[in-house]
Amino acid sequence: MYDEILSNYTDSEIVQICKFLNKDYNIYEPDEVRWEKIKYAFYKTSEQTISELQKETFSNEFINRLMLKYYACERVIKYHFIKYLKKAIHDIVAFEMSIGDSRIDICRINGKLCAYEIKTEYDNYDRLETQMKDYFSAFERVYIIVPIQNAETVQAYITSQCGIITYRLDESGNMIFAYRRSAQDNKCDINFCLNSLSSGDLVKIVKSLRLKPLKTKNENLELLLDVAKEKNIWSIYKHFLKEKYKEQWNYLRGNFDKILPIDCQSFFSSKMNPDLLYEKEKNHRACL
């Protein structure tokens, strides 16, 4: 039925459908709400056909299958790259870490603090200059991940210090990543990094230095900035990040095979039990 439905649409129309469904895709929405969006998006398909489809699958599963095959958006690239990164058992990985005025798509903490910014074939480079300025202030190595056909174009928007990773899909639908240019080691700005942290994060670092936390965020920030003038606390900052994201990353790694691909980031953030979420959707389907 899946192929039968899609056969009524051109590839271009399917991409537009994927864009619509991806825009506000939310795993916490009720299954019936997502199905209403699917009905709206597949405007050539009868309600009866969609109702029959609902008996075969649940909305998350249908949207995931659609995205993986037809729409290599950021969620899809993240899934494939995380699948690649999780093989390094001693590394800690985080999503959407705030730094300055930017949010890095993927942060990797091993011996080095690494940033990975994803630019898909559907993205432009309008904000890349600002993003790169923030990333080079906060990460020891910075990479940009782009489609293989954009490897040359993107070089006009990044410095020679930035590494380039390309991706492509093979005939089996597997995503192949290749390091086209190595990232050069970069000296970070600890003051900039500390300024990007929340009040609670600053308190944890203060305590890790065996100091007494002060009353306000600004006071704790000034305390740490003063300490940073006297000694190098970069390793302490990196250790803090590793501890901050370790539990979430280990949870995602441990449940990776139970989670639908484009749902990975949501489960990283929430640590929700995938068995419970998807079982709820399956039970709803069984009641139709």
List PLM regions with ranges.
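Nuclease-adjacent, charged terminal/linker segments that flank catalytic cores
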Residues: 1-49, 245-288
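Acidic-basic catalytic patches of nuclease active cores, encompassing PD-(D/E)XK
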Residues: 54-93
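Conserved catalytic cores of phosphodiester-cleaving nucleases, focusing on short active-site segments
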Residues: 81, 106-108, 112-121
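Long, charged, glycine-rich C-terminal linkers/tails
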Residues: 95-100
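Short acidic-glycine loop/turn motifs at beta-strand connectors
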Residues: 110-112, 168-172
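Catalytic cores of nucleic-acid endonucleases
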Residues: 122-168
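A conserved mid-domain beta-alpha-beta active-site/ligand-binding segment of alpha/beta enzyme cores
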Residues: 172-245
